[in-house]
């Protein structure tokens, strides 16, 4: 069983436990009634539709490949730093076992900042989409390799009904076709293989031509330098998601400024 398989299986267990506390029907009703006073519908994808490269900056305490990244996880302070430095969106890890994330991190960050937040988790059930809306998320991550074609299409429709965005993540040619057929409006290429966690930043370049120009294209993971940013700009990406590089920077604002201006 790969790490990704384990993450997906643990997500199913988490959802089963959450449903014991709040049923699917209940979470649906709460989500439908939840209004974001600071953001418009589909604020996440609108934030990525600008002439210049957009930056999605990640708040994460740990990862399966790197272990503990930020022992003193000042998540609200980090989120404020990102927003002050010009981040367009914030990605918040909520997976608790391998990433040491928490729903509370997302809930509090979404209340604190004025830019859209995406719930970074391993979505395997529609329940998690409704849950994300109640936590203040403007978007959710949908990973093709842990979903069927039918699930992906249904989950995108649920997002649309709630006014939130779906960042559909792919890693290869087959998943690119799957995402396009499902009607994804935002497609992210993960440069990290979630089955073995190896990184190849050339993956974004390799898959770029398979994504129509009217779909927002995001390059995810492995971005460390201004050279990486220039390469991403060259392939016509609309946005980049940066995690560990910013989390390990002593001065996150200075590091983001450096990357944004490259």
Describe the predicted segments one by one.
Residues 2-70:
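An N-cap/entry alpha-helix motif that binds or orients negatively charged groups
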Residues 59, 66-167, 173-179, 204-207:
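N-terminal active-site wall of soluble small-molecule enzyme domains
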Residues 206-210, 233, 248-262:
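C-terminal helical cap(s) of enzyme catalytic domains, especially alpha/beta-barrels
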Residues 10, 60-62, 95, 122, ...:
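Active-site beta-loop-alpha junctions enriched in small/polar residues
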Residues 7, 57, 82, 132, ...:
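Conserved, mostly hydrophobic/aromatic
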Residues 131-150, 188-197, 237-255:
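Glycine-rich phosphate-binding active-site loops on the catalytic face of alpha/beta enzymes
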Residues 124-135, 173-182, 219, 223-242:
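Catalytic cores of alpha/beta
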């Amino acid at each position: 069983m790969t790490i990704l398989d384990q993450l997906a299986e643990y997500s199913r267990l988490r959802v089963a436990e959450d449903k014991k506390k709040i049923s699917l029907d209940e979470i649906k009703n709460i989500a439908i009634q939840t209004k974001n006073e600071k953001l418009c519908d589909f604020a996440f994808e609108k934030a990525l539709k600008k002439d210049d490269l957009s930056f999605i900056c990640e708040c994460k305490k740990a990862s399966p490949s790197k272990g503990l990244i930020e022992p003193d996880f000042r998540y609200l302070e980090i989120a404020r730093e990102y927003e002050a430095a010009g981040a367009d969106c914030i990605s918040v890890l909520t997976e608790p076992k391998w990433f040491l994330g928490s729903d509370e991190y997302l809930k509090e960050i979404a209340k604190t900042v004025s830019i859209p937040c995406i719930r970074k988790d391993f979505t395997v059930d529609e329940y998690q989409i409704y849950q994300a809306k109640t936590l203040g998320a403007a978007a959710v991550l949908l990973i093709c390799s842990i979903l069927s074609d039918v699930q992906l299409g249904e989950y995108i429709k649920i997002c649309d009904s709630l006014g939130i965005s779906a960042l559909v993540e792919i890693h290869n040619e087959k998943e690119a076709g799957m995402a396009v057929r499902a009607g994804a409006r935002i497609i992210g290429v993960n440069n990290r293989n979630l089955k073995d966690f190896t990184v190849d930043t050339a993956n974004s370049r390799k898959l770029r031509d398979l994504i129509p120009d009217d779909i927002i294209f995001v390059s995810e993971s492995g971005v460390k330098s201004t050279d990486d940013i220039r390469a991403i700009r060259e392939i016509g990406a609309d946005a980049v998601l940066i995690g560990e590089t910013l989390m390990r920077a002593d001065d996150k604002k200075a590091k983001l400024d450096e990357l944004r201006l490259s």
